[in-house]
Every structure is written in structure tokens, then in C-alpha cells.
């Protein structure tokens, strides 16, 4: 899943589509992208989502930077969330850069987070989704800090 502007260029459209990627409109709750995510998960596929909505370089992942889509999809599909912290990406591809630079990056994988149970109606509790999003934010912050340290990047 990636921002829809990545599909406007034929080369990047081909690249991301060939990897199984699909666009998401970040300006609203993109129901089509959320449903595509649920379908892929139901088929046993992995779906990569960035709950911050864009690249952030720290030092703090603020609560208002987080979007609820990951917690919603995980809970709707009753699929655990596997949080991942990435360190060093700002050196490999600084914001606005056109090319990736050789640079040390570190990926740290955390323990899975359990989705919230569905209501009897089969719906997802909005307050439960928000609580799971906050749990995810806390987990990601710790993983990001660890990944930055391992990549030798000051987290400031």
C-alpha cells in the first residue's frame, strides 16, 4: 500500500504494482484500499501499512501522527499487527531525494499486537481501534528508537 501519487508515474506504477502494491488516498478513509487490505489478508497475504501516513524521522511519534487504518484492518480481519521499526532510512533516501543512497539501515521487528475483538454485531469498536492505535504507537516508538541506535543515527 502506498500513497496514490506513486502510481502517477508509469515507471513507479509498474514497479509498485509488480510488487503487489496498491494505491491509497491519504486525504480520507479510503474504503477501497481498506477493503483490498482485508481481502489480501483473508487470502493469507501480508500487507505492509505505515500508520504514520508518511515517513517520519523522529525523535517522537506523536499521537496525532498516527492513523487508525492499521488497527481497524487488523481488528476487522482478526489479524495480529507485527510492528516494525526502521532506522537509518533518512540517510538512505532523505525527503525530496530522487535516488536511494547506499547507507546502513536497520529493521527491528517487535512482538505481535493482538487485534481487538469484534462486537456481537461484527463491527469494530471505535474506542478499541483508538486504544490499539495508541498501543501500536508506543510499540513503534520503542522499535524506532532501537533501530535508530543500531543504525548509528542520533534520535534527536
Residue ranges of predicted features:
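Non-catalytic C-terminal accessory region of glycerolipid acyltransferases
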Residues: 32-156
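Catalytic core of membrane glycerolipid acyltransferases/transacylases, capturing the structured
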Residues: 1-29, 36
